């Protein structure tokens, strides 16, 4: 198995393991929990202090090797799963000067070149959030936004970060997340 294919498998497996752990907690009758394995998250109920769980979306800058140290946004969640795919930690620069991420584009079988910096997905299960995040990264911004509009009707919500023309971050998010976000200039509901 190639290292790229192995990486895709490992990332998808992580979401599945989060779901298995969450299911085990529910079978034990635990109603309030958060399971987090390397940023793949599933939560139910509320925090001990009350209110929804709060999960950070990292700032996707090159070389950000410190998970959780640079939070761009906090999203409040309950009874769902959350996963982020991005191109800011594991990538290389190709011969044409393009950033090539570790995400494999299933249409080509090659590493994806994406104009998305990160794709955060909220879904019923972590395996779904993981898979959709990878898909959105492979699709790129315009096609990902188009697909996200369709998937929002099925309860799949997104928070995409791109780099604008001036280099500042631009965010595209599902309208259903609006109430949980601290919106700034450069934020766009899809």
Residue ranges and their predicted role:
Residues 44-49, 173-174:
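Short acidic, glycine/serine/threonine-rich loops at helix termini
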Residues 1-9:
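Single conserved hydrophobic/aromatic residue that forms the stacking wall/gate
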Residues 37-39, 98-161:
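Proteins synthesized as precursors that undergo proteolytic processing into mature forms
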Residues 3, 95-96, 106-108, 165:
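Short, ordered coil/turn segments that flank beta-strands lining enzyme active or ligand-binding pockets
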């Amino acid at each position: 198995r190639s290292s790229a294919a192995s990486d895709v498998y490992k990332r998808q497996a992580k979401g599945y393991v989060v779901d298995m752990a969450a299911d085990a907690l529910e079978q034990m009758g635990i109603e309030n929990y958060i399971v987090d394995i390397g940023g793949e998250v599933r939560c139910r109920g509320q925090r001990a202090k009350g209110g929804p769980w709060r999960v950070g979306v990292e700032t996707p800058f090159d070389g950000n090797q410190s998970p959780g140290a640079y939070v761009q946004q906090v999203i409040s969640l309950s009874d769902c799963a959350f996963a982020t795919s991005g191109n800011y930690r594991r990538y290389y620069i190709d011969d044409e000067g393009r950033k090539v991420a570790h995400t494999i584009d299933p249409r080509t079988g090659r590493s994806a070149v994406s104009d998305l910096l990160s794709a955060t997905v909220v879904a019923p299960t972590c395996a779904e959030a993981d898979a959709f995040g990878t898909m959105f990264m492979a699709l790129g911004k315009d096609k990902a936004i188009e697909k996200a509009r369709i998937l929002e009707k099925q309860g799949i919500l997104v928070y995409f970060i791109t780099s604008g023309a001036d280099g500042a971050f631009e965010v595209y998010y599902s309208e259903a997340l609006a109430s949980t976000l601290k919106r700034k200039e450069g934020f766009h509901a899809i």
